[in-house]
Amino acid sequence: MTQAVLKELAKAELHCHLDGSLSLPAIRKLANMADIILPSSDKELRKYVIAPAQTESLVDYLKTFEFIRPLLQTKEALRFAAYDVARQAALENVIYIEIRFAPELSMDKGLTASDTVLAVLEGLADAQKEFNIVARALVCGMRQSSHKTTKDIIKHIVDLAPKGLVGFDFAGDEFSYPTDSLVDLIQEVKRSGYPMTLHAGECGCAKHIADSLNLGIKRMGHVTALTGQRDLIKRFVEEDVVAEMCLTSNLQTKAASSIQSFPYQELYDAGGKITINTDNRTVSDTNLTKEYSLFVTYFGTKIEDFLVFNQNAVKASFTSDSEKDTLLHKLQENYDSYLK
C-alpha cells in the first residue's frame, strides 16, 4: 500500500488535541498575533514544539505544550488555530474530525470558557466552509485542576451543543490524578448531557481502564495498559467500548515501551473496536497517513481493516445520527474503489 493510496483513503479521527497539532506556519502566525518572538529557523522552532522520539514519560511529553499556551489566549488566535488543524486534516482526506482542547489553558488573559469554545467552533466552521470536512469540538477538563475550576467550565459550556460542541474528555496527568479521583466530575458532565470519552490507561495502570468501564465510559483514549490483560480486554470488547489508539504518541511517552507492548494486536484478535488517531500532529510529528503507514508496516493492516476502523470512528463519534449516516456512505463509496 503506497503513501499516496493511504493519503487518499477517507478517514475519521476522534482523538486530536488542538494545541498539540498546530502547523509550523500557524505557530508563526499566532506568535506574530501575540507579539511573541520565535526562533527564525523552522529547524530551531521544531525543537520547542515537537517532542523527542523518546521522552522520559507522559509528564515529560506534556511539557512541550507550555510553549504553545501563550499563543492561544485570544478569540482570534483560537479561531485561527482550530481552522488550521481542521485544514491539515482535510488535506489528507479526513472527512470527520473531533478536535479537543482545554478552555482553561486559554483563559490566562481574561477569556471565559464559553469565549474559548465559541472561538474554536467558529474556526471549525470556517474550515468546513472551505474544505470537504465535518469538524466538531470536544472540551477537555484537566485532571490536575481543581474540581471547582472544572465544574465552572462545565457550567459555562452546558448550552453550547447546538453550536457544534459535541462532547467532553479529561486529559492531563493520569498517573497523579487517576479516574477514580474524577467520579464527581464525570457525573457532573453526564448530568450536563454531553457524551464522554476519557484518557484511560495511558500511564500503564489497567485499573484506570477498569474504573472507566465501571463508570459506563464507552470511548477511551490510548488504553495502552490493556496489553496482557486478557480478562480486561474481554470485558472491554463485551461492553462494546471503542479504543482511540495513538501509536506514535504512545511510543514517544513510553506508554508502550515497544511495538510488541502496544495492545493493538490483542484487541484486534479479540474483536475489539479500534480507531486510529494522531493525538498530537505536531508534538508527535505525525499525521493520519503516517499512522496508517505504521499500522501497515508493523501489523500488516489491510484496506478492509482501515474501512472498519473508520466505520468504528464514525459510529462512535458524538455527531448527529443523520451526519453519521452521510459519513458512513462517504466512507463506503471511497473504499469501494480500492476493494474491488
Swiss-Prot record:
It comes from Streptococcus agalactiae serotype Ia (strain ATCC 27591 / A909 / CDC SS700). Gene3D superfamilies: Metal-dependent hydrolases. It comes from the Bacteria. Zn(2+) binds at H15, H17, H199, D279. The keyword Metal-binding applies. One of its GO terms (cellular component) is cytosol. One of its GO terms (biological process) is hypoxanthine salvage. Catalyzes the hydrolytic deamination of adenosine and 2-deoxyadenosine. Its cofactor is Zn(2+). This is Adenosine deaminase. InterPro entries: A_deaminase (IPR028893), A_deaminase_dom (IPR001365), Ado/ade_deaminase (IPR006330), Metal_Hydrolase (IPR032466). Belongs to the metallo-dependent hydrolases superfamily. Adenosine and AMP deaminases family. Adenosine deaminase subfamily. Transmembrane segments: none annotated. The active site is at E202. Binds 1 zinc ion per subunit. Substrate binds at H17, D19, G172. It is an enzyme of class 3 (hydrolase). GO terms for molecular function: 2'-deoxyadenosine deaminase activity; adenosine deaminase activity; zinc ion binding. The keyword Cytoplasm does not apply.
